[in-house]
Regions:
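Solvent-exposed beta-strand/loop surfaces, strongest in extracytoplasmic domains of secreted
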Residues: 1-163
């Protein structure tokens, strides 16, 4: 009687990772479960880069990566997945209340007092120091002007211009 033994070495399988490209987010939105939501066909853990809570700069096609480690590393390999995400510029919130009337000949100054939720520069039309003209129509003095402001955030790569 002959006896023989054969060593059989099983090759681990690659798990299947499914990760759909996330919807566009706006700068300031931290990465979370809506973006970092890969799934696999076997139990295991996911490690994302960048990590949850990261705020990305504005820009398209930014890479998100996941390393999946299966619970059973004898039967399954560690696997990697990638998707891209687009991050749109945010729009600053500019607040400017209608100013009170001013006396004829008074240059614009404190009326030009808009604020924004991010740092930046305000450009007013008419500019500070401008004395608005008064017109007389049928004996009545009138002066109605549209005051305008353009706001440019210091971080213009992540924020839109507000007009």
């Amino acid at each position: 009687m002959l006896a023989a033994s054969v060593d059989v070495e099983a090759t681990p399988d690659d798990p299947v990772i499914i990760w759909v490209k996330p919807a566009v987010i706006i700068h300031g939105t931290p990465l979370g479960q809506l973006q970092l939501n890969a799934v696999a066909n076997v139990p295991g853990t996911f490690e994302y880069s960048p990590v949850a809570g990261t705020v990305l700069n504005a820009g398209n096609g930014q890479s998100l990566q996941v390393i999946f480690t299966p619970d059973d590393t004898t039967e399954f390999n560690v696997a990697e997945g990638r998707v891209t995400i687009d991050v749109a510029k945010a729009t600053p919130v500019v607040t400017w209340f209608n100013p009170l009337g001013i006396e004829e000949g008074t240059p614009l100054d404190i009326q030009l007092n808009a604020t924004a939720n991010v740092s930046g520069t305000f450009d007013y039309t008419p500019a500070a120091g401008t004395a608005l003209e008064v017109h007389t129509i049928l004996g009545e003095k009138y002066s109605i002007y549209d005051l305008k402001v353009v706001f440019v955030a210091d971080d213009h790569s992540n924020y839109n211009i507000v007009e």
